[in-house]
Amino acid sequence: MAEAKVLSGAGLRGQVAGQTALSTVGQAGAGLTYRGYDVRELAADAQFEEVAYLLLYGELPSKAELAAYSAKLSKLRDLPQALKEVLERIPADAHPMDVMSTGCSFLGNIEPEKDFSVQRDVTDRLLAAFPAIMCYWYRFSHDGKRIDCVTDEPSIGGHFLHLLHGKKPSELHEKVMNVSLILYAEHEFNASTFTARVCASTLSDLYSCITAAIGSLRGPLHGGANEAAMEMIERFSSAQEAIEGTLGMLERKDKIMGFGHAIYKDSDPRNEVIKGWSKKLADEVGDTTLFPVSEAIDKTMWEQKKLFPNADFYHASAYHFMGIPTKLFTPIFVCSRLTGWAAHVFEQRANNRIIRPSAEYIGVEQRKFVPIERR
């Protein structure tokens, strides 16, 4: 057996842990592409369903292929009665990410992936069902309403907003949700994606891989940054107060979520996109506080620490302007990143070897066992 190479760097920073044809992250200090397409171009001109098709099927769809794919997803939106009954038993104070993992896992019990030949069908089912899993639980546990899980909205983003608010979303809100889902769809070997690939390398089923990824995203160092950013932004009532508060947090060495990135060195290309849409939403509602506060924090972090906002920071205000409860921010991430997770599972399965690294032992030297009577 060849001697294992010791990898340096906490959290495997800077280490190449495998190959992928799905995305590039941080090339030349910035940039994000999905199968060669710049995410900024996709966010400007594509539908999320086109991007999902690109990631899952390998190429952008034709007009006919997109129509057929969207129609397929629309037909898969409803939830089985058994799953609805499970969701009704989950309390309102449950962690929404636990709701998503429970929903995914339970669906795998009643609609199992019988073999890998149906992996795309299973993914399409989850892609169609995840908005309803989130919203059915939320509306029942918080409002006492059993909602219809089927809408006539053509897009997944519009469908989610309709389920959440019980009415057709505005054209602007549907567009922003579409952009958001595209921006969060895929991001190379992040923690949750690598978790999914490790699970897939054991030849586990797709539901288990996605449930494992959701569990990884649940952690505050991976998912939840937009929720934490929203909670921080809401503390301040003016831009000046935000500047003073941010300086105080920096002086106390408090953790400020939504800034910097493990891979990007100069900027996060997703941020410039969602910031622009957040500004449009702010203008629509006549906001004079939330967006100026966000910009003040942004400016202060750059001036003091040369840290730029990542995709999560302005997503917080964008979601808030659309009336989305803060606790649902990360589950929306799940609805989007499912496409990337599943595509990585497909990729892992296509050229698989179980992921089993070695560890550098740093414990005590070998010693002789002492019977309990002599200890």
Name each model feature, range by range.
Residues 1-375:
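Non-transmembrane, aqueous-exposed alpha-helical and coiled segments at domain scale
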